[in-house]
Amino acid sequence: MKKVCAMASTIFNPEKPKQSFNELEAVGLHEVMFDFGLIISPEGILIDRSSEEPKFKPQKTRKSYQTIIKQFAEHGFMPSIARLPFVDVRLNPGNIYQYKELNNLILQVNIDCIRACEEMGCYDIIIQPLFAGLKPEEQWEANKAFFLTLASACQNKNTRLLLINQCQNFNGHLVRGVCSDGMDAAKWLDALNQEAGRACFGFCLDVGICNLCGQNMQSMAMALDKRIWAVILTENDGKNFAKLLPFTNAYGRSSTMDWLSAVRGLRDICFDGYLILETVDTTVAFSPLLQPYLFPVYKALLDYFAMQINIENDLKKYNQVVLFGAGNMCRNYMKCYGKKYPPLFTCDNNPKLWNTEFEGLQVKNPDELKTLPKDCGVIICNIFYREIENQLRAMGIKNIGYFNDEYMPSFYFERLKREVEPEEERSL
């Protein structure tokens, strides 16, 4: 799984990105999604054309992003995924002639940007479907012609064009737009790949758009399945178009975003593509002096989501597993994965639990882990992950996995209660 940050959230000066690159690499982030929308805008060109002294010059714009790409190359930070310029879904050009002109501009700009992507070796490209001025019954034919034209402009057989789900403006409200229905989007992709004669089309799932459209992300992911090559992780309040840091739009001590269905869906399809963190509205709300301190949080969030999505894939790596922990998390493991990936036993640091049975497992002294076969993994089922991981590494154990029960297929809603000895109670 590739962990990526959006360019606007992390590269503060695209023409002089060295400091941003150094700060990203210092926390273990090695890639950003190249965003052509920071350099060129089809709607901006349209507005510029109507002015008395147009400023847009195609050659000048091309030189601008070539200069930025050169900076990326010089610092060894070349992207493998890019996003072409998007048109604001709230845009209202005014008349049908401007819509047509806008869509023609989008095609021209996208072809130019695709060529730039291929020149820098970036072959996964996120492209916004056409929507401006199109009636629902016109959307498929217009986008079919649009995307097949873009595919024919690709000069490298490895180039993949990723459609993305959209919302639309309806009397000031953001509602479901083009490619917002998973089954319809899947049909579009299959038809486009068939017409193109090769699998050059895929999908980028923006979970923020799903939230604005009030969608179940698990159903969306399962409808698209392996067609999903990239996922944009961002948050909003379900009403306003925003790109916020996950878990920051909180109310009542919890996020208002349906992360449960997002993680479950990506886990169901064994997603292993690009995880793209996009947080530009949160980032720019901070002073430039504080923004670099967000980078470790970005890395932690990407690692966290990758871990959650990969929980079952990580279990498949080992021929046998043993659990560490004999509490609520162990119980949830046994409920959700106990039959499919049965543990040999579990262990716990509490001596009072040794040689007892919990959820059908024998509870042993952690010292027993020293005798495990080499192909056996130790899965930490306890909230004190870092402490237990250090303990295991000190014992010479290398095959360490993590289990977390926040986004399980099903839950025990009653928490496990154990009797507390008087001396233990006094120490709490």
Feature locations, PLM:
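N-terminal pre-domain/capping segments
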Residues: 1-122, 155, 198-200, 299, ...
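Histidine-acidic metal/acid-base catalytic patches
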Residues: 1-5, 14-28, 121, 182-205, ...
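Active-site beta-loop-alpha junctions enriched in small/polar residues
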Residues: 7-11, 37-39, 84-87, 130-132, ...
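Conserved beta-strand positions in the central sheet of alpha/beta enzyme cores
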Residues: 33, 81, 126, 162, ...
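Generic enzyme active-site microenvironment
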Residues: 33, 162-164, 204-206, 211, ...
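Alpha-helix N-cap and loop-to-helix initiation/capping positions
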Residues: 48-63, 97-108, 135-146, 173-184, ...
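Active-site acidic/histidine proton-transfer and metal-coordination neighborhood
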Residues: 74, 89-202, 212, 300, ...
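Hydrophobic, well-ordered beta-alpha structural blocks that scaffold small-molecule cofactor pockets
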Residues: 294-428
